[in-house]
Amino acid sequence: MNKYPIIVSLLLSAGYWCSPVSAAEACRADNTSVAARYEVTNRPPDSERLFRSKAVDHKIAEIKSQLTNAKLAWMFENCFPNTIDTTVHYRKGEDGKNDTFVYTGDIHAMWLRDSGAQVWPYVQLANEDKALKDMLEGVIRRQLKCIILDPYANAFNDGPTGGEWMSDMTDMIPDVHERKWEIDSLCYPIRLAYEYWKVTGDSSIFDDEWLTAMDKILATFREQQRYD
C-alpha cells in the first residue's frame, strides 16, 4: 500500500503543506512574534521584588549582551534573579546580625538544602554588592540557627508558627515545618559557608554559633552510623 498520498492528505488537513512563498511569510511573521514575546519580562514589578541587587542586575545585562539567542537571553533574565525576586526575606535578627529566610518556591518554609542551592549562584557576586553579601551571610546564619534548633529537621518555619505536618509521628516543634532527616540537609549549609568564605574572605560566620552547629552535625552523623 502506498502511504505517500495518505501522508500528504494528513499534512494538507493539518495545514502543514503550503507554497514556498507563504511558508517564508509565515516564518517571518513567527520570528517577529517570537522576538516581541521575548521582550516582555516575567519578573515581578520592581516594587514587588523581595530583594534587589545591583550586582545581579549588572550580571543579567552582561550575559544578555553576549547571547545571540533571544529565547536563552529571555530565560536567563527571568530565571537568574528569581530567588531574590520572589523567595528571599532579609532582615536584621534580634542579635543585630544579618538574617535571611528563604522560601522554597511557593512553600512558605525554608529547606536547608534547597536554600543553600537557591542562593549559590549569587555567591560569586558577593564582593560586588554589599547588600548581596549581607543577604548571603544572613542565609548562613539562619541555617546555623535551624541546625542548632533541630539537626534532624529538613525544613523550618519563619518562627514558631506550626504547620500541616505537626501531627507527624516524630518530635515536632512549632519552628519545624518538616522533620525528614536527610544527610544533605546538613551538608549544604557547610558547602555554602565554605564557598562564601572562599569568595569573600569573611570569617565572621565561623563564630560560637558555627561551632555549636558543627558539634550538632558531627553528633548527628555519628549517631546515624549506628548499626541497629
PLM region spans:
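Cleavable N-terminal signal peptides
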Residues: S9, V21-A24
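Bacterial N-terminal signal peptides
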Residues: I7-Y16
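Polar helix-capping/helix-linker motif
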Residues: S13, S53, N69, D129, ...
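Short, solvent-exposed loop/turn segments at the edges of secondary structure
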Residues: W17-P20, D184
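Aromatic-rich carbohydrate-recognition surfaces in CAZymes
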Residues: H108-L136, I140-D228
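Positively charged n-region of N-terminal signal peptides that target proteins for export
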Residues: M1-Y4
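Feature targets compositionally biased, intrinsically disordered low-complexity regions
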Residues: S13-A14, T104, T200
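Low-complexity, Ser/Thr/Pro/Gly-enriched N-terminal "stalk/linker" regions
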Residues: E25-R113
